[in-house]
């Protein structure tokens, strides 16, 4: 059976935590920031965990992580 390939775009966006879940950067913080409040931008700076229903998809994209 051939080797499974890692999706390189996913490898740049997701990191695995110690508990086996995946974390990523929040979206919506690249442009059009003037209409967004300081509170909203501050909360978008943090990391977020991938939802449980999407974890299987991310694991399939990152077979060796």
UniProtKB/Swiss-Prot annotation:
Keyword NAD: no
Bias-annotated ranges (Basic residues): 12-30
Protein name stated in the entry: Large ribosomal subunit protein bL35
Gene Ontology terms: biological process: translation
GO molecular function, one term: structural constituent of ribosome
Highest classification ranks of the organism: Bacteria, Pseudomonadati, Pseudomonadota, Gammaproteobacteria, Alteromonadales
Annotated Pfam families: Ribosomal_L35p
Organism: Alteromonas mediterranea (strain DSM 17117 / CIP 110805 / LMG 28347 / Deep ecotype)
Family: Belongs to the bacterial ribosomal protein bL35 family.
Keyword Ribosomal protein: yes
Keyword list, A-Z: Ribonucleoprotein, Ribosomal protein
Gene name tied to this protein: rpmI
InterPro entries: Ribosomal_bL35 (IPR001706), Ribosomal_bL35-like (IPR021137), Ribosomal_bL35_CS (IPR018265), Ribosomal_bL35_sf (IPR037229)
PROSITE patterns attached to this UniProt entry: RIBOSOMAL_L35
GO cellular component terms given for this protein: cytosolic large ribosomal subunit
Region entry Disordered, spans: 1-30
């Amino acid at each position: 059976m051939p080797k499974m390939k890692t999706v390189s775009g996913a490898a740049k966006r997701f990191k695995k935590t110690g508990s086996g879940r995946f974390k990523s950067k929040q979206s919506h913080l690249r442009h059009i920031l003037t209409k967004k409040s300081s509170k909203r931008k501050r909360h978008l700076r943090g990391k977020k965990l991938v939802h449980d229903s999407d974890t299987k998809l991310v694991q399939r994209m990152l077979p060796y992580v």
